[in-house]
Amino acid sequence: MTKEKTINLSFGRTICKASINDLSIVMELIEQGKAKMIKAGNPNQWSASYPAESTIKCDIAQGDCYLLYECGKPIATFVAKAGPEPNYHRIYKGDWLDDQPYYVIHRVASVEGVHGVMADIIKYCSTLTSSIRIDTHADNRPMQASLTRLGFVYCGVIYVENGDSRLAFQCVF
């Protein structure tokens, strides 16, 4: 666990940047996240090969990959980085809330049975920016519910590299 930029949260939770030494932990969390998505009726958001280990290595190298720990145990991973996000240049069936600088959150994955992960991620990201954008699959109902509960506004539809559509959300603090 990298000690720099550690953010203390409630319930013995901390968030810190992942290092290359954490790669296997991040990949295991992603596999658990995939299983959770399938179980929740969202089998199509992440494929067997996405996110690839090479993508995660790049996220880590750029300093954008994070781990959420509870009492010293890794329970979630995510990517948070400053925009612009190329897939967000065009939005359909709506508009972004503003044109100000923002952070984007990607690749959120957590172990089964933990709650409040998105709230902790948003709390951390709100220390970095006053605007967050995120997208999710139409079948990812748990994520959509979390985002709405946390004050995100549905803004429209974006398309990712492979042409699949995603629901786009934004929160301005």
Predicted regions and their residues:
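Conserved GNAT-fold acetyl-CoA-binding loop/helix
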Residues: 34-54
